[in-house]
Amino acid sequence: RGLGDVYKRQAYAMGSLFFGSNPNLVCGIVLEYSVPVAVTAFMWISMFGGNGPLALTIILTSSVISPVTIPLTLKLLLGATVSIDVPSMMQDMAFMIAIPAVLGIVINELTRGWGHEKLSPALSPACKFMMMGVIASNSTAMSEYVLHMNAVRLEVALFILTFAISGFVVGFLVARALHLPYSETTTMCFTCGMRNISSGAVIATQYFPGEVVFP
């Protein structure tokens, strides 16, 4: 949680430093690091022998509190330069992220693990295709900016790539500093480095100009 707050502030500070003349780009950069931890991080954590229960706890916690943290973060950091409908965004985030996460927990508890052991693997392929569809459909909002690429947008892309990689590095360094075992170090790396970009794309498309989707 603490690392997440630090990263949001760093994203805002560095975004403002390099791209402060364009509030839409700064908004997109901050939004990128305000969304919850990516659900797909759990898949990578499992593949590399990470701590599954810890990963699920981090992912679900960040998802459940996101209807509050995302709008408030954007309002606090960008409220002076970008118009933000906080109540409407909170409502949409609750239905899009928090409620599905809570329902998943409830179903798994009521079925005594059947949801995780049987239902989740069965639905996983379809969910991946649907996720790709959501990302693709919402990414059309930035097609104009990709087709008309300029030096500033190339700089934004390079910045996002570098900042994203740094998330994995910071997670690793913090885990090593705390002398965490391999499984928890792996979990820290992926949960610090991966964000739910599909939800970010939906938020950007619904509430902001198309250029916000680009970062």
Question: Which residues does each predicted region cover?
Answer:
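Short, small-residue-biased leader/transition segments that mark boundaries at the very start
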Residues: G2-Y7
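Membrane-interface helix termini and inter-helical loops of multi-pass transporters
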Residues: G15-P23, K75-S88, G113-E117, M142-E155
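Transmembrane alpha-helical segments of multi-pass membrane transport proteins and ion-pumping complexes
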Residues: K8-S16, A38-F42, S66-L76, M96-I105, ...
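The feature identifies polytopic integral membrane transport proteins across all domains of life
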Residues: S21-Y33, G50-L60, V86-S88, K118, ...
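Interhelical loops and loop-helix junctions of multi-pass membrane transporters/channels
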Residues: S21-A41, I58-S63, L72-F95
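Transmembrane helical segments that form the transport core of multi-pass membrane transport proteins
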Residues: L119-M188
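Alpha-helical transmembrane segments of multi-pass integral membrane proteins
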Residues: S62-P71, M93-N108, S124-T140
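Generic transmembrane alpha-helix signature in multi-pass membrane proteins
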Residues: A11-L17, C27-L31, A38-G52, L56-I59, ...
